[in-house]
Amino acid sequence: MKSTPITSLGDYVERVTSEEGSGRMFRGHSSDAFDLIPVAGRYKTPARSLKSKQIADEKYLLNRFRREAAHLLPSGLSDWELLFVARHHGLPTRLLDWSRNPMVALYFAVESRSKGTAVVFSEDYLPSVDTTKTPDPFVVSKVRRVIPPHMTHRISAQDSLFTIHPDPTAAYTSKTLIRYTISTNLKGVLKAQIRQLGFHEASLFGDLDSIAQKIAF
């Protein structure tokens, strides 16, 4: 994995727009201590290290989300669609969120006030899952890209796509992965600059909480 320090917003834009590959996707982390591990795999225990137990736990959470959020969800959601919505609202799943837009990833890297180096990951094209031919997310056997329908404001505003990880406890890496690092001192500067360009809580989340956060910043 290639690692490159970023020195300014212009430097970042120049680097990401000069990358090879037409299918690049981007993901921002507020700390370089975080690996590319889905939330469902971040709390590994001896029992959950068993694949059957891991899947059972995830399905339990997903079914509970479907049941308890039924009054807020469109009817007839497929398992994939439910998984997309659940992940965007914080449920632990085997999905990782990415964006086609490098500025969205930069927002998620620098929006936190936490100290330390932030990171934007950039990955080249991965084979996609055809969700119509593979209706069960839990039978996917390799890390794959998943392209969701623009079924919610968040998915559309964030130009979202996902990767699905058959072993969510394993950190993802590849030879085509690029890691852009952002120093603590630069994070606040970049956050202010991209807000002026329209990348902020209200534009990317579009709910009352995010609008209030934008005003309060």
How should each PLM-predicted stretch be described?
Residues 1-217:
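Catalytic-core elements of nucleic-acid end-processing and repair enzymes
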